[in-house]
Amino acid sequence: MLLDRIEKENDIKQIAKEDYDALAQEIREFLIEKISETGGHLGSNLGAVELTMALHLALTLPEDKIIWDVGHQSYTHKLLTGRRDGFATLRKYHGMSGFPKRKESECDCFDTGHSSTSVSAGLGMVKARDLRGEKNTIVSVIGDGSLTGGMAYEALNNASQLETNYIIVLNDNNMSISENVGGISTYLNNVRTATGYLDLKEGVYKALKGTSRGESVIAKIRRLKNGVKQLVIPGMFFEEMGITYLGPVDGHDVNALIRVIGEAKRVKGAVLVHVVTEKGKGYAPAQRHPARFHGAEPFEIESGLPKNPRNTSNYTDVFSTVMCKLGQREENVVAITAAMPDGTGLKRFRNMYPDRFFDVGIAEEHAVTFAAGLAAGGMRPVVAIYSSFLQRAYDQILHDVCLQSLPVVFAIDRAGLVGADGETHQGIFDLSYLSSIPGMTVMAPKNKWELSDMMKFAVHFDGPIAVRYPRGEAYAGLSEYRAPVVYGESEWIYEESEVALLAVGSMVKTAEQVRDRLKAAGHACSLVNVRFVKPADEKMIRRAAAGHRLIVTMEENVASGGYGDRVRACLADAESSTRLYTVTLPDAYVEHGNTELLKRELSLDADSIFEKIEEYL
């Protein structure tokens, strides 16, 4: 096995050129085998194998630096830098991360997880290099999906002023999570499909390479490259920005990639290398279903089907269903996603109401202000977005939506702990950052029925409103009773004495388990479904304080600025002597791992909460 000869960074340079294709095949087989067991980002990594090999062959790590945008396509990089054994624990608690981690390897120079950050980070590292008088090579690898994000263009605009070398590799597979949209995607597609140019370039190069005067002719052709490209490739967008453009290059030809990276290293200034790859290359199911294999659960290699198929609906499914019903009933309801129609559950809405569906690309800031404009124009926009990604648009929520009290609905998926994707994706801050904004209403459903009811309430609410719900199976609840959603009011599920459990959203299920344990231990226990985190139901809080020895708040959110803080402030204002125990996540980033395991480790499970309450009593 060629892969057995690679134990650390730079060992790949021992591999003979004629073995590059065989090594790429071994890497793909390794990734398919391991990810079929652990789950992970398969499609993007299969598409980036040769590109990663070429970078490692053309550079010297860790002196040279590679910044991976988003970072989910860094598995081959990890494999080539001595982390082969880590794949057994990929995305497991205390195991190897699915993203680059500085603490994991000195070859990971910058932590990533969100989109469109690599060019800014790389530019900063270039400036640091120059100020320190160093000569190493800095490379940022960014996908065409990430290039739909505005931050990437802010950085490109800045990078165009560089006078020292900085390489930006555009890994163009015409996909982000779902298929790319927008003007830049159309532009890149025109470049990508300019086969006349690509074939001409490669054909001329190969024909001249073996002749006596071939190298001198090639050099002259290269000096004329800008003029030729202007004739063949429409727009020359990057060149017009002041960034040297090289490509398009076949992203699955290691030798061609090494040549172009070598050429890029000689450029004085910023240079963009346009590499065309295929997401999922080498594995037929991933090529047929690229969105499904973006982030795959463990699967059967032969069929590509999940090993543990889901038999129940999840919260995203529930949201998808209610949005389609709302679209039918309310002609002014429109839906917005930031490049994730599949992940957010809006694909069905898109198919049913294409004129009222908007995929804005990986552009959360634009998505929110675009929604504000729709609301100002008389529509009822629903922005469906993951909790960890919505935090990128905080200023737009505050300045463009809430300041004007515009009726924008934020459907916040993946709120709370999300598990295997780790620190960059845990949705544990939204209650805090949304509750800090004047005029924002924040709701959290206890189960799938309440999610539907809250969405129906939200689209008729005259102001900004957020509904946050977790990843995973949609809890049906212990009872099908559905108390009407009344603005600012909580729901008393049980009312007794001694202990009052005030649970937010997904924590209601855990609170029911805690209550059972307390009852078995002889304690009278009330249970409140908070429903509205903001505005907090102060009448309910005062009632709980008057009738109980201990109030326990429960939320999947960090402590600072969360619901527990709001209850503490209310009790202080009322000069209440009732004791308060807040069950929250710690003031820390939460690593990757199984969600239930993380809850136990962080004392958010029923047993841990029960034991702590026993201590208070």
Regions found by a protein language model. Name each.
Residues M1-L80, E239, I243-Y245, D250-I258, ...:
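N-terminal amphipathic, basic-rich helices that act as targeting or association modules
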Residues L3, N174-F319:
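Long, well-ordered, tryptophan-enriched scaffold segments
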